[in-house]
A protein has these predicted regions:
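Transmembrane helix-loop-helix hairpins at lipid-water interfaces of multipass membrane proteins
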Residues: 52-116, 197-201, 312-316
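Membrane-proximal cytosolic tails and large cytosolic loops of membrane proteins
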Residues: 1-35, 89
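A short amphipathic helical element positioned immediately N-terminal to and/or at the very start
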Residues: 33-49, 159
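An intracellular "coupling" helix at the cytosolic face of ABC transporter transmembrane type-1 domains
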Residues: 148-149, 167-174, 178, 186, ...
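Short intracellular "coupling" helices and adjacent cytoplasmic loop segments at the cytosolic face
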Residues: 20-29, 129, 137-161, 165-167, ...
Length: 617
């Protein structure tokens, strides 16, 4: 890292993360293939079609009863108005019995509507949650069948968002959109029919306001979209900056870069403020515009209704019902617009989910697989060629024979292909040409699970999960007893420090295992590998994260562990592999030297150059 204070400060590298949360007014993401994604989703929902049809029927019936309410209520208003007029004229009174019957009938309509609405909501929620449950299960199962190259070409957040963000978005949109479409369309049609039954003239007057409101709303949306996009873009920038600063706060403090960090944040925050203010202001205009246009409609209906009532064409109750219908008429239009956005979100989310489910899988099993009772541990690389891309071969004609129980060290500069060889051995990738044999059988003739059961691994990047230390070590062999776990910890020289921790083996590690040191993490993963007791071991910089004193203790434990087992050790510190039975020196994907430590030093070749360079100072 540069120590030049004049150089512009750069944030620590970004950690993989999923999509940012949706901010207010975020532009709805659209699917690339809306029709295709919708077809796949409909097919996926096939087992629930009977329930979905029931939901549609219940939603329609609920809406019919609800729409009928205002007109029935209008009869009570008319009866009340006529009764008052008769009472004033002295020709009669108010018929409260009739009004009571009308009100009870109206109440019954709304109760029945609510019952059907409750039923359809209950059924639809069940469909949605079952779909999300099944989809998460399918995605999780799919992850276990995916090739390693898929995950290495994507961030963790991108993959995990399929299970979290995309499935949640799909579930929420699915739950709301189906019933909302049926309800809104039924309400729109039913309301229009009721309005026409009361007065075609008043219906025409009320419909004239719709184009006006649409034009005004379209104008506002058109001018606010660019600010919404900018708002969401800079919201993502700010979220990213906050996460990076939090992850690298020690580096920032160490280099006294707090002021530069705050300045960078303020610049992005100012842009976010301006775009958010404009977008929210323009967005806030829509409701006043709708209310203003709606009031114009009410005024038109009131004037025309009053004239028609004077002429005895319609009653006062009809005017009251019609005003209610005008109010209800604009609501489903707004709901349909919202549903259109939900459908776009649902299609986009389902598209990403189905794209993932349609990804190419690796072959988990093979026909007539090799199933040896016991793997001895002989390994042969026979003229192996490999490239992550077909047109870029990085390992060229790699050949080596390893006898059972031998300790093989693989050394070389960064990018020489050391870790790639391990990935090929574990069948995380398949060779482009040539073959890798274990106990004389091509590893492609083994089921992947059977092959990987033969390997124990300790990697440079430690992985521990949230749970107790005992559970983390036992992950190497789930049926191991507590005594076997403790014995493995002792062999890995981890027992002593575990006993000093609060709770000992029952201490709970947090999500990132940040409540133990990096060296302690490595000791725990070594204990896990010892417990697994696999015939073939892979150690990729297994002692790189511990101090020299701890390294010596671990190296002794590993020497005992590797006796009688075939071991592949990838190391940059060449002092740790002096006792290896064979050292393979790699450069640019090829083995350029092979032999023991002393033999290679005597050759005074590339290995000797690497070894001496580590002790020059």
């Amino acid at each position: 890292m540069s120590e030049n204070n004049n150089e512009q400060f750069k944030m620590p590298p970004k950690r993989p993360r999923g999509p940012m949360g949706r901010g207010p007014g975020m532009i709805t993401e659209k699917a690339r293939d809306f029709k295709g994604s919708t077809k796949k989703l409909i097919k996926y929902l096939g087992r629930y079609w009977a329930a979905i049809i029931a939901v549609m029927i219940f939603a329609a019936v609920s809406t019919v009863f609800s729409v009928a309410g205002p007109k029935v209520m209008g009869k009570a208003t008319t009866a009340l108005a006529e009764g008052l007029m008769n009472k004033i004229a002295g020709t009669g009174g108010i018929d409260f019995d009739y009004i009571a019957k009308v009100l009870l009938f109206t109440l019954a309509l709304y109760v029945v509507s609510a019952i059907f609405m409750f039923a359809q909501g209950l059924i639809m929620t069940g469909i949605t949650q079952k779909t999300c449950y099944r989809m998460r299960k399918d995605i999780t199962s799919k992850i276990n069948r995916m090739p390693m190259k898929y995950f290495e070409s994507r961030t963790y957040g991108e993959v995990l968002s399929r299970i979290t963000n995309d499935v949640d978005t799909l579930g929420q949109s699915l739950n709301q959109s189906i019933t909302q479409i049926i309800t809104s369309v039924a309400t729109l049609v039913g309301t229009l029919v009721m309005m026409l039954s009361i007065s075609p003239l008043m219906t025409l007057i009320s419909l004239v306001i719709l184009p006006v409101s649409m034009i005004l709303i379209s104008f506002v949306i058109k001018h606010s979209q660019k600010y919404f996009r900018q708002q969401q873009e800079y919201l993502g920038h700010i979220n990213g900056q906050v996460e990076e600063v939090y992850g690298g706060h020690l580096v920032i403090k160490a280099y006294n870069k707090e002021a530069e960090t705050v300045k960078t944040f303020k610049e992005a925050n100012n842009v976010l403020y301006k775009s958010a203010w404009k977008s929210q202001f323009l967005s806030g205009l829509m409701m006043p515009i709708m209310q203003f246009v709606g009031n114009l409609g009410y005024a038109g209906v009131a004037i025309s209704g009053g004239i028609l009532a004077i002429k005895n064409v319609i009653t006062i109750g009809d005017i009251q019902a019609f005003i209610q219908y005008v109010k209800n008429f604009t609501q489903p239009i707004q709901q349909i617009a919202q549903v259109a956005n939900q459908l776009q979100s649902m299609a986009a989310a389902s598209e990403r989910v189905f794209e993932f489910l349609d990804e190419e899988e690796e072959d988990i099993t093979v026909e007539n697989p090799v199933k040896p009772d016991h793997i001895e541990g002989s390994v042969e690389f026979s003229h192996v060629h490999f490239g992550y891309n077909p047109d870029q071969i990085i390992i060229n004609d790699f050949s080596a024979k390893v006898k059972p129980g031998q300790q093989v060290a693989i050394v070389g500069p960064t990018g020489a292909g050391k870790t790639t060889m391990v990935k090929l051995l574990m069948r995380f990738y398949d060779v482009s040409s040539g073959a890798i044999l274990v106990d004389g059988h091509d590893i492609r003739d083994y089921n992947r699970a059977d092959l990987r059961d033969a390997f124990g691994m300790v990697l440079q990047d430690t992985w521990l999960f949230k749970g107790t230390i005992m559970e983390n070590i036992r992950y190497g062999r789930l049926d191991a007893t507590d005594e076997e776990v403790i014995a493995a910890a002792k062999a890995a020289h981890a027992h002593h420090f575990i006993q000093t921790l609060p709770g000992g083996y029952d201490m709970e590690l947090n999500e990132d295992a940040s409540n133990v040191s990096q060296g302690q993490k490595q000791l725990l993963t070594i204990a896990r590998a010892i417990l697994a007791d696999n015939p073939i071991l892979i150690l990729d910089e297994a002692t790189s994260s511990v101090d020299t004193r701890t390294e010596i203790r671990i190296q002794k434990a590993l020497d005992n562990l590797m006796k009688g087992r075939t071991s592949f050790v990838i190391a940059h510190r060449l002092s740790t592999i002096k006792n290896a039975d064979m050292i393979l020196v790699m450069k640019d994907g090829d083995i350029i030297e092979q032999g023991t430590h002393d033999e290679l030093l005597a050759k005074n070749g590339f290995y000797a150059e690497l070894y001496n360079s580590q002790f020059e100072e």
